[in-house]
Regions:
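Nucleotide/phosphate-binding catalytic cleft detector across ATP-hydrolyzing
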Residues: 1-128, 141-254, 261-283, 287-288, ...
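Short acidic, Gly/Ser-rich segments with clustered Asp/Glu that frequently serve as metal-coordination loops
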Residues: 133-135
């Protein structure tokens, strides 16, 4: 996601100068004196020092460059990662400059459930599919707990890579990651197959800058390939879910959230392939955050769902 991008200046101080969308806009255009880092990859922390720098920068930006101390922090993390990987999330805060009072970890499927407004304690069965940038987490919850959760190393960024590979193979043309992402948003979001857009890049044969025209009809099969990965896993989980819970999922429907869940066609194909209605989050990029907000405001009621890190 954009929030996990760090923009850093190389040198003795190595200070962040931008994060998020501002940093990403400079990606693939940076000079040698600038380094772009993606410290969070496939649901886990790939670069601890960069992640700590990102954390400090975010806090300074939100607090008017004042140090925040003595606060309680709630972090949503994938359920299907190791305890060591979960511990790394809490270390971001404990090793940063915020000096936390307490750090709580919440399994992201549970945070999503609360963010969706579900009565988690009485919930008999619900499937939540969280499609992010680098990962997709498919979870089944029942009676306040997670029955099963599977983290796939497949998110919206994979579709960007499929588009880049297709353009390279079919047109002998190289495009950057940001260009591929723009094509994804413009063409796959199209409700018809007659939309087109010009892509700027480099001709592999000539070795010179150029442009090509890509159509929504051309990239539609790529989207289907991406969707099928998610749908196949969702069906597999449903097939191995106890019958009583499966019936509740059938009645309640599948909940779809996450920034990449908005890619056109995913919800419709998921419903067709599973035979289960799909409920799309009103604010898919904010669902887990809304859940964390509930925990922060109702700490006593939420105590059973959070883990206090030491």
């Amino acid at each position: 996601s954009a929030a996990s991008d760090v923009y850093k200046r190389q040198g003795k101080e190595n200070k962040p100068i931008a994060i998020g969308e501002t940093a990403y806009e400079m990606y693939e255009k940076e000079p040698p004196s600038i380094h772009v880092s993606f410290p969070l990859q496939h649901g886990v922390i790939a670069h601890m020092q960069d992640m700590i720098a990102l954390w400090n920068y975010m806090n300074y930006s939100l607090s008017g460059k004042k140090k925040i101390k003595g606060c309680e922090y709630y972090l949503a993390v994938p359920a299907d990662i190791t305890e060591v990987e979960k511990q790394a999330y809490s270390q971001i805060i404990s090793r940063g400059e915020t000096k936390p009072k307490k750090v709580f970890l919440v399994d992201k499927p549970v945070a999503n459930a609360f963010g969706l407004g579900l009565d988690v304690e009485k919930l008999r069965g619900a499937m939540i599919i969280d499609v992010g940038a680098d990962t997709t987490e498919i979870s089944v919850l029942s009676l306040g707990g997670i029955v099963v959760s599977k983290l796939l190393p497949s998110g919206g960024n994979e579709l960007d890579m499929l588009i880049r590979s297709y353009v390279r193979k079919e047109y002998n043309f190289l495009i950057g990651r940001r260009t591929a992402e723009q094509a994804k948003k413009e063409l796959i979001a199209a409700t018809t197959l007659d939309r087109s857009m010009k892509l700027v890049g480099r001709d592999v044969v000539k070795g010179l800058p150029g442009e090509i025209t890509l159509t929504s009809a051309a990239v539609a099969p790529l989207a289907t390939t991406f969707f099928e990965t998610i749908i196949t896993q969702a069906r597999s989980i449903m097939e191995h879910t106890p019958p009583e819970i499966s019936m509740d999922i059938k009645e309640r429907g599948i909940y779809l959230t996450g920034g990449s869940s908005e890619i056109h066609g995913l919800a419709a194909l998921l419903q067709t392939k599973t035979g289960v209605a799909v409920n799309i989050s009103d604010k898919p990029q904010e669902t887990a955050v809304s859940g964390l907000g509930y925990f922060a405001e109702h700490s006593k009621q939420a105590a059973k769902y959070v883990t206090l890190m030491k």
